[in-house]
Amino acid sequence: MTKIIAFAGKKQSGKNTCCSFLHGYQLRSYHLVEDFGLDEEGCLVVDTMMLDASGQAQKTMGALDVTRTDHDFSLWAASNMWPFVKHYSFASALKEICVGLFGLSKDQCYGSDIDKNQLTWFRWSDMPGYKGKKKDKMTAREFMQYVGTDVFRYIHPSIWTDRTLSSISNESPALALISDCRFQNEVEAVQRAGGKVIKLTRGLDSDGHSSETSVDKLKGCDATIDNSKLTIEETNGEIVELMNSWGWLGSVIEKPKEKDPDNLVGGIQKIKE
C-alpha cells in the first residue's frame, strides 16, 4: 500500500526541500543510490557515473530534479524511481491548464519565484467574481492562485485533491510525496487516503491570498515541525525521527550485488563547481 506524506506550509516554508530530502532517503533505502545530499537551493543531488573528456567513467554528484515529467526523464523514472518514490503536487493539473490553455510559460508555472512573479497579460479587472481594487496586470503566481482557488475550487472544492489522489492510487508508488498542502480539505483528503500531513511553520506572511493564509488555520495535521529556526539538516533530522516513529522509513530490501552503474538517463545534470 502506498504511504502518502503531504507537507503543509506557506511559500518558502521548505516543503519542496523536505520532499527532495525524502526522495534521496528513499532511493538510498532501496539501494538505488549510495549517497545523496541537498545543494544550496535545497535540490536533491545523488552519486552517479559520468564520462569525462577522455571517455572514462568517473564517479561524481549530480542534480536530480524530482519534479521533472519530460519524456526522457519519464522513461528512466518509470522503472528506476517512481515505483519507489514519486513527487506529486495538488497544483500540477492547474499548471498544465495554465500552460496549455492560458498560454503561460513553463518557467512562469514551474520556475523560480522570480519566474512566477513575472507579469502576464491577464488583468485583475478581467477576473470573474473579483471584487478587489486591483486593476493592473497579474503576475503568473497571482493568476494561478486566483484561477486555481477562486475559480476552480469555487466550482468544485475537491477538484485538485481528487485528481492528485486518483493519480497516486493508479500509479501506486511505495512512497508518494505531496509538496503543497494548504487547505483543510486537502489535509482531510490525504488522511482519508491513509496518508499523513506534516506542517512546517517557516514561511512568508506577505501573501494575503487564501491559498497562503489558510495554512494558519489548518487543524488535525499529524505532526508539526517548527523549522523557523532550524537549519535544513536539523529539519531533515526531525523528519527522519518522525517518520521512523511511524515505521515509514528504513532499508527495505537487501543490497544487490555490485554491477556497473548506469547513468541516470536524462535525470542527472553535473553540478558546476
Describe the function of each predicted region.
Residues 1-5:
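Extreme N-terminal starter segment of soluble prokaryotic enzymes
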Residues 6-13, 20, 32, 36-39, ...:
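Small-molecule kinase domains that catalyze NTP-dependent phosphoryl transfer to phosphate-bearing small molecules
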Residues 8, 90, 179-181:
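Short His-Asn-centered micro-motif
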Residues 18-26:
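A short, Lys/Arg-enriched amphipathic alpha-helix followed by its capping loop at the start of a domain
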Residues 26, 30, 102:
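Active-site catalytic pocket residues across diverse enzymes, especially alpha/beta-hydrolases
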Residues 29, 85, 176, 195-198:
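Hydrophobic anchor at the start of a short beta-strand
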Residues 37-174:
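ATP-dependent small-molecule kinase phosphotransfer cores
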Residues 144, 178, 225:
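Residue-level signature of catalytic and energy-coupling elements of molecular machines
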